[in-house]
């Protein structure tokens, strides 16, 4: 929160829980305030701009390639370089939020120069908030947000009910679709591991707050590399799991949520990576787990 871990590449590449931004901080504003200032307004409904997919904010996995830059001033102080704007559903109108801990000049090889320093406008009589001034620069910059990489195209992958709805229809959400037709019918698959111990993990979605700590833990446990801002912009981040954040409701300025949906590496029972690995670095254990033998891996990424 104050930049003490700014030189940690794992944490810089960890997506923000709400806006999925990596390697940067931004100035968060509401959709209504963005329209008032004329920032991050898409030319059409399919253009990705900071925090939205064109004019549609709800039930989409928006993101951006470019965000408008603004200057932020307060009591004679000014953030040393123009700050990118980001539209945040649920953000209060006429309020701008910028996270501290970025824009450090001597953080180290990883953290130096990343982001924008909110400390430039922090004052002893206004440590956390105050009435400032904002000016649009007429320029844009690229922000590495992973939201755009997993657009769900309106598919109902996250389902939310309150207690009354669940009591009225307890079977809600238990419907199962049939398997797609295949040349290799599922019923004929050889169930080699069905007689052994079954491993599984459950996640209480009522408790998950989208902190992403499990994403970093997985990265540390599995030696997953950091790829950097440029490669994240190319959808090449290598995390084995992610925590999607969704908003619902019909009012873009007062949405429901956020709701968090973990999307995990599945430890597949019939893992396709095991079949294609040329050096048998990924193999199946006797208990049905998808195991990795690191000293065999040659990095083909098949």
PLM features: residue spans?
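Short, well-ordered strand-loop elements centered on a beta-strand within folded domains, enriched
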Residues: 81-83, 93-98, 143, 252-263, ...
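Non-heme iron-sulfur electron-transfer modules
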Residues: 221-256, 283-296
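Long hydrophobic segments that form regular secondary structure
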Residues: 18-21, 28-40, 196, 274-289, ...
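Active-site-adjacent "gating/activation" loops or surface patches in catalytic cores
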Residues: 176-195, 235-276
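Cysteine-centered iron-sulfur cluster-binding motifs in ferredoxin-type domains/subunits
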Residues: 200-222, 259-280, 289-302
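A cross-kingdom feature strongest in bacterial/archaeal respiratory oxidoreductases
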Residues: 1-239
């Amino acid at each position: 929160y104050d930049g003490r871990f700014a030189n940690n590449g794992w944490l810089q590449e960890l997506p923000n829980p709400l806006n999925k931004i990596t390697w940067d901080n931004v100035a968060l504003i509401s959709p209504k305030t963005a329209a008032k200032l004329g920032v991050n307004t898409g030319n059409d409904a399919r253009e990705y701009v900071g925090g939205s997919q064109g004019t549609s904010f709800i039930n989409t996995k928006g993101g951006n390639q470019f965000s408008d830059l603004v200057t932020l001033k307060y009591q004679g102080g000014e953030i040393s370089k123009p700050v990118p704007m980001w539209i945040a559903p649920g953000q209060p109108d006429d309020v701008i939020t910028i996270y501290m801990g970025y824009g450090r000049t001597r953080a180290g090889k990883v953290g130096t120069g990343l982001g924008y320093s909110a400390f430039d406008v922090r004052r002893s009589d206004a440590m956390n908030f105050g009435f400032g001034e904002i000016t649009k620069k007429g320029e844009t910059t690229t922000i590495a947000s992973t939201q755009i990489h997993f657009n769900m195209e309106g598919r109902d992958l996250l389902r939310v009910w309150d207690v009354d709805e669940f009591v009225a229809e307890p079977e809600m959400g238990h419907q199962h679709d049939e398997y797609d037709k295949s040349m290799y019918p599922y019923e004929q698959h050889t169930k080699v591991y069905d007689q052994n111990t079954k491993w599984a993990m459950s996640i209480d979605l009522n408790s998950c707050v989208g902190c992403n700590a499990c994403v970093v833990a997985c990265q540390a446990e599995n030696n997953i590399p950091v790829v950097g801002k440029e490669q994240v912009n190319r959808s090449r981040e290598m995390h084995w799991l992610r925590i999607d954040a969704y908003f619902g409701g019909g009012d873009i300025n007062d949405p429901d949520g956020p709701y968090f949906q973990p999307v995990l590496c599945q430890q597949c029972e019939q893992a396709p990576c095991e079949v294609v690995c040329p050096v048998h670095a990924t193999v199946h254990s006797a208990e049905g787990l998808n195991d990795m033998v690191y000293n065999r891996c040659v990095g083909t990424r098949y």
